[in-house]
């Protein structure tokens, strides 16, 4: 990824039915890797007529931890007349790198790995180095699910509904503490400098 950032999805700008993309104005809350404008355009694969694996199109106010690359329309330029956004970025690997951010009532931030891909990757690559899946208590879990529902009702269906320390990891809906991921990103940055 060129950029790893915590962002908030803003206004819907347009959709391109030809490419199956939707564009949103997006605000950066924090950058963990790379350089990106404070406000940029997020190109998401999916639109009103088609979604990737039935995964929902983002909505206003979604807080996301994203792994991004610069959006490149050059493969469409010769065939279609498209609006170009010079400050547009898109998800690397479509949805496998989308992580929704939410909080419990104490303000602790959690990241929902909606597809379980991060957990699966971390187990294969460097299990001792990667952050552990968080296992919040039942009360915290209900708060997290409630806050996810406020962002998007579909998200609450993905999050675990029972506090279960024996729940299999690498499952859709794994939760991580944002602070654990930030520490992990800092260690990765130190390793590559």
Predicted regions and their residues:
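Short coil-to-beta-strand transition motifs
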Residues: 1-8
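Netrin-like (NTR/C345C) domain of secreted extracellular proteins
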Residues: 47, 51-193
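OB-fold (S1/OB) nucleic-acid-binding surfaces
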Residues: 17-46
């Amino acid at each position: 990824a060129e950029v790893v950032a915590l962002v908030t999805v803003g206004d819907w700008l347009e959709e391109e039915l030809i490419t199956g993309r939707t564009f949103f104005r997006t605000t950066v809350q924090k950058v963990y890797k790379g350089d990106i404008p404070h406000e940029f355009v997020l190109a998401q694969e999916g639109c009103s007529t088609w979604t990737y694996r039935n995964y929902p199109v983002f909505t206003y106010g979604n807080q996301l931890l994203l792994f991004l690359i610069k959006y490149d329309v050059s493969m469409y330029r010769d065939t279609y007349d498209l609006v170009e956004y010079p400050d547009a970025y898109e998800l690397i690997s479509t949805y496998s790198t989308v992580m929704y951010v939410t909080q419990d009532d104490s303000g602790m931030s959690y990241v929902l790995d909606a597809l379980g891909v991060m957990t699966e990757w971390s187990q294969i690559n460097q299990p001792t180095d990667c952050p552990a899946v968080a296992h919040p208590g039942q009360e915290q879990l209900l708060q997290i699910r409630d806050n996810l529902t406020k962002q998007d009702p579909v998200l609450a269906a993905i999050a675990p509904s029972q506090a279960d320390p024996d729940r299999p990891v690498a499952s859709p809906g794994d939760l991580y503490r944002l602070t654990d991921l930030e520490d992990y990103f800092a260690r990765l940055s130190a390793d590559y400098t």
